[in-house]
From Swiss-Prot:
Pfam families per record: Prismane
Source organism of the structure: Shigella flexneri
Name of this protein: Hydroxylamine reductase
Catalysed reactions, as listed in the record: A + NH4(+) + H2O = hydroxylamine + AH2 + H(+)
Gene expressing this chain: hcp
List of residues binding [2Fe-2S] cluster: C5, C8, C20, C27
Length: 552
C-alpha cells in the first residue's frame, strides 16, 4: 500500500505530484507507519469528541487530557517510526474514549456524540489489516470532492494543531496544565474529525489554533523558567572535552536535568545537541559542571555526527532519522514519544543503562581547543535590554532588528539563511531562535556598543520571548508591532514551525518572509490569501529581500 503525507518541507514535490505517496516518505517513514499514524489521528479525534461531550457534564479526565496531545505529538515529523507503538497509542486512545463515554453515560443515559470518529474500533491486531483500515482516514481521500484549497486548509489546521500539541506535551512534562487550553484543543481536534469543508471556518480555525498556541507557549515558558530559572547569557563550548560522554538531543529539559543528576560524580560528561543547546542558559542546568558543551550542528547532519560521537545518544523528542545509516543504532536511545524500530526505548526517567554504556565506551581521547558561543538571551534578559535597544535606535546606532530563526533542514537553498545573516549590516541586530541558528551561530558578528549583534533567544517555543519583547518595544515607543524596525525571516521544516507562524499571524504580525519553500499543502490560491491578509511571502534573493526589509 502507499501513503499520503505532505506535512514537512522535504516532502516530494514535482509537476506531477505533491506529497510523499510511495512505500516510504522522504523522512524515512514507511507507508505502513504513515498510514497507521492516520489511523491514530482518527482515534484521537474520536477521543477528543467525547472529551468535549464530557466537559458538558462537568467531567474532566486528566488522563485523557495528558494522553491526547502526547500521542498526537508522536505523529509529528521525525518523532516516531515504530508502527507497533503507533498502534499501541491508537488502542490506548480507544480505551480512554470508552472509559470517558461510560462516565458520560453514567450521568446521562442518552449521551451521544455526532462525530464520524466517535465510535472507531480497530479491525484487527494485524498491522497489514490495520493499514488497510487506515485508508479510510487518508487526509486526501475526498480531495476530488472538496478541491485542493479546502484540503490545504484542513492540513494547515491539522498540522498547526499538531505543533501546538507538541508544545502542550512539553509544558505538561513540566507540570503545566490549563483546562481552557485542553478544552480548546479537544474542540478543534474533534471538529477536524468531521472533515470540515467551509473555507472561512477553516481560516478562522487556523487563527484560533495560533491564539491557543500563544497561551501554550506562555505556560511552557512558565514551566521552564519556574523549574530551571530564567536563562541568562552563557558561553558554551562547541568543541570536545576529554572523557566519557553522553549526547542528549531534543527539547525536553526535564530529561536533561534527570540525566545530569544521575551522571553527577560518575565521570561521564554530558553534551547537548540540536534544540537542547539553549539549556546551557538555565541556571539550574548549567550548575552541573559535567554539562561540558554542545556537539554537532543541525539535526539533518546527525547520521555523520552521531556516528563520530564516542558515547551513547538520547533522543528526547524530534528529530530522529535512520540510525542504521551511521551504524550507531546500538547506542542511540529513545525517550517519551520518540521511536525507531529496533532501537532501545527508555520508558521512564532512569538513565542508568545509558550511563553504564557510556562508561564502557572510550569517550573523547583529548580536549580540543575551545570554541565558545553565547546563548541564554531569555525573556527576562531580552526585556531587560528593551531600554538599551530603544536608546540605540534613538541615537541611530541600531537601524534594524532581524528575527532570523526557525527550523533547519537539508535543502541546499537553506544556505540563503547563512548568506542573509552574514549580509546583515553592522548597525543591525540578529535575534535568532530554534535550530535554524546552526546555519550561522558559530560565526562572529561583533557588537553594537557592547550589545551582541547575534542574540540567541532559545528553542523554537521561545518565539514567545521574542513576541513579548516586540510587544514591549512597541508599547514603550507608542506604536504597533508592525511599525517597529523589526523584520521576521523564518525558515520552516515541520509542524512546530507551522503553529509558530499561525501564532504570529493570529497576533496580527505582518510582512513575514518565509522559506526556503512554501509548504506543499498550501496551494497558490491559499498563499495569495495569506499574502493579501498578512503580507506573508516567500524568500527571493538575499539582496532583494534585504533591500526591501530595510526600506519597509
Amino acid at each position: 500500500m502507499i501513503m499520503f503525507c505532505v506535512q514537512c518541507e522535504q516532502t516530494i514535490r514535482t509537476p506531477a505530484e505533491n506529497g510523499c505517496s510511495y512505500a516510504q516518505g522522504m523522512c524515512g517513514k514507511t507507508a505502513e507507519t504513515s498510514d497507521l499514524q492516520d489511523l491514530l489521528i482518527a482515534a484521537l479525534q474520536g477521543l477528543s469528541a467525547w472529551a468535549v461531550k464530557a466537559r458538558e457534564y462537568g467531567i474532566i479526565n486528566h488522563d485523557v487530557d495528558s494522553f491526547a496531545p502526547r500521542a498526537f505529538f508522536s505523529t509529528l515529523t521525525n518523532v516516531n517510526f515504530d508502527s507497533p507503538r503507533i498502534v499501541g497509542y491508537a488502542r490506548e486512545a480507544i480505551a480512554l474514549r470508552e472509559a470517558l463515554k461510560a462516565q458520560c453515560l453514567a450521568v446521562d443515559a442518552n449521551a451521544r456524540v455526532d462525530n464520524p470518529m466517535a465510535d472507531l474500533q480497530l479491525v484487527s491486531d494485524d498491522l497489514g489489516e490495520l493499514q488497510r483500515q487506515a485508508a479510510e482516514f487518508t487526509p486526501n481521500k475526498d480531495k476530488a470532492a472538496i478541491g485542493e484549497n479546502i484540503l490545504g486548509l484542513r492540513l494547515l489546521c491539522l498540522y498547526g494543531l499538531k505543533g501546538a500539541a507538541a508544545y502542550m506535551e512539553h509544558a505538561h512534562v513540566l507540570g503545566q496544565y490549563d483546562n481552557d487550553i485542553y478544552a480548546q484543543y479537544h474542540k478543534i481536534m474533534a471538529w477536524l474529525g468531521t472533515w470540515p469543508a467551509d473555507m472561512n471556518a477553516l481560516l478562522e480555525c487556523s487563527m484560533e489554533i495560533g491564539q491557543m498556541n500563544f497561551k501554550v507557549m506562555s505556560i511552557l515558558d512558565a514551566g521552564e523558567t519556574g523549574k530551571y530559572g530564567h536563562p541568562t547569557p552563557t558561553q558554551v563550548n562547541v568543541k570536545a572535552t576529554a572523557g566519557k560522554c553522553i549526547l542528549i538531543s531534543g527539547h525536553d529539559l526535564k530529561d536533561l536535568y534527570n540525566l545530569l543528576e544521575q551522571t553527577e560524580g560518575t565521570g561521564v560528561n554530558v553534551y547537548t545537541h540540536g534544540e537542547m543547546l539553549p539549556a546551557h542558559g538555565y541556571p539550574e542546568l548549567r550548575k552541573f559542571k559535567h554539562l561540558v558543551g554542545n556537539y554537532g550542528s543541525g539535526w539533518q547532519n546527525q547520521q555523520v555526527e552521531f556516528a563520530r560521537f564516542p558515547g551513547p545518544i538520547v533522543m528526547t523528542s524530534n528529530c530522529i532519522i535512520d540510525p542504521t545509516v551511521g551504524a550507531y543504532d546500538d547506542r542511540i536511545w529513545t525517550r517519551s514519544i520518540v521511536g525507531w524500530p529496533g532501537v532501545r526505548h527508555l520508558d521512564g526517567e532512569d538513565f542508568s543503562a545509558v550511563i553504564a554504556q557510556a562508561q564502557q565506551m572510550a569517550g573523547f581521547p583529548y580536549s580540543e581547543i575551545p570554541h565558545l558561543i553565547t546563548v541564554g538571551f531569555g525573556r527576562q534578559t531580552l526585556l531587560g535590554a528593551a531600554d538599551t535597544l530603544i536608546d540605540l535606535v534613538s541615537r541611530e546606532k541600531l537601524r534594524h532588528i532581524f528575527l532570523l530563526g526557525g527550523c533547519d533542514g537539508a535543502r541546499g537553498e537553506r544556505h540563503y539563511f547563512t548568506d542573509f545573516a552574514t549580509s546583515v549590516p553592522d548597525d543591525c541586530l540578529i535575534l535568532t531562535l530554534a535550530c535554524g541558528k546552526y546555519r550561522f551561530n558559530k560565526l562572529e558578528f561583533g557588537d553594537i556598543e557592547g550589545l551582541p549583534r547575534l542574540v540567541d533567544a532559545g528553542q523554537c517555543n521561545d518565539a514567545y520571548s521574542a513576541i513579548i519583547l516586540a510587544v514591549t518595544l512597541a508599547e514603550k515607543l507608542g506604536c504597533g508591532v508592525n511599525d517597529l524596525p523589526l523584520s521576521l525571516v523564518l525558515s520552516w521544516f515541520e509542524q512546530k514551525a507551522i503553529v509558530i507562524l499561525l501564532t504570529l499571524l493570529s497576533l496580527g504580525v505582518k510582512n513575514i518572509v518565509t522559506g526556503p519553500t512554501a509548504p506543499g499543502f498550501l496551494t497558490p490560491d491559499l498563499l495569495a490569501v495569506l499574502n493579501e491578509k498578512f503580507g506573508l511571502r516567500s524568500i527571493t534573493t538575499v539582496e532583494e529581500d534585504m533591500k526591501q526589509l530595510l526600506n519597509a
